[in-house]
C-alpha cells in the first residue's frame, strides 16, 4: 500500500508550521519547528523568495494532504465528492477529511497522531457501531459510535494517547468517554471549529484552474 515515507518533522518544516504528525513530541520543545523554523535542505534558511499564485495554492494543498495523511489520488477523490455535495466545496472538503475513520480515531484520542490512528484501524483495533472496520478512509456518519476493541484498550500507547487527549479536551463535534474507550461522532464539524491556519479556498482555486 502506497504511503508517504518522508520524515515527519521534515514535512512540518517544509510547510512552516506544526502538522502534529509525531504525537506528543509536537507538544514539546523537541519539536523540529521549535528548533529549526525554516525549510529543510541546503538552502532552507534562505528560501524566502516569493511564490507565484499557483505556488501558494499548490503549497496549501500539500499542507492539507500532509496534515490528514492523504495521498494525491485519495485527495482528488475526496475533493470530487466535496464538489458534488451541497454547500461550499472547501468546507465540504474539510468535513469529509475529518469524517474519515482515521481522523475520527485521532480526534477521539485513541491514537497520538493520525499515523498511529491509521495503524490502529488497519490492525483491527477499532469498532464502528459494534463491527470491526479496518479501512482508514471509511466514512463515519453522524450518530456512529466508534470504540476501541477490548484488545486495543489495554495497549500502553493507546492509554497514553487517551490520557493526553483528555487533558487537552475533545472537539465539540464528538462525545467521548475516555474511560470506556468509546465515542460518538455527533456531527460534521463547522468551519469555525477547524484550524484557522488552513486556507481551503486556495485548494478550490487550484482545482478550478
Swiss-Prot record:
The record's GO CC annotations read: small ribosomal subunit
List residues of the S4 RNA-binding domain.
Answer: 99-164
Q: Which domain of life is it from?
A: Bacteria
Looking up InterPro entries in the UniProt record yields: Ribosomal_uS4, Ribosomal_uS4_bac-type, Ribosomal_uS4_CS, Ribosomal_uS4_N, S4_RNA-bd, S4_RNA-bd_sf
Is Cell cycle set as a keyword in this record?
no
Give TM regions.
none
GO annotation, biological process? ribosomal small subunit biogenesis; translation
**Gene3D superfamilies in the cross-refs:** Ribosomal Protein S4 Delta 41, Chain A, domain 1, RNA-binding S4 domain
Gene Ontology terms, MF aspect: rRNA binding; structural constituent of ribosome
* Family annotation (NCBIfam families): PRK05327.1 (NF003717), rpsD_bact (TIGR01017)
> Mind telling me which HAMAP family this protein's record contains?
Ribosomal_uS4_B
Subunit note? Part of the 30S ribosomal subunit. Contacts protein S5. The interaction surface between S4 and S5 is involved in control of translational fidelity.
Family per record: Belongs to the universal ribosomal protein uS4 family.
Query: What task does this protein carry out?
Result: One of the primary rRNA binding proteins, it binds directly to 16S rRNA where it nucleates assembly of the body of the 30S subunit. With S5 and S12 plays an important role in translational accuracy.
What name is this protein filed under? Small ribosomal subunit protein uS4
Look up and give the organism this protein is from: Aromatoleum aromaticum (strain DSM 19018 / LMG 30748 / EbN1)
Its ancestry begins with: Bacteria, Pseudomonadati, Pseudomonadota, Betaproteobacteria, Rhodocyclales
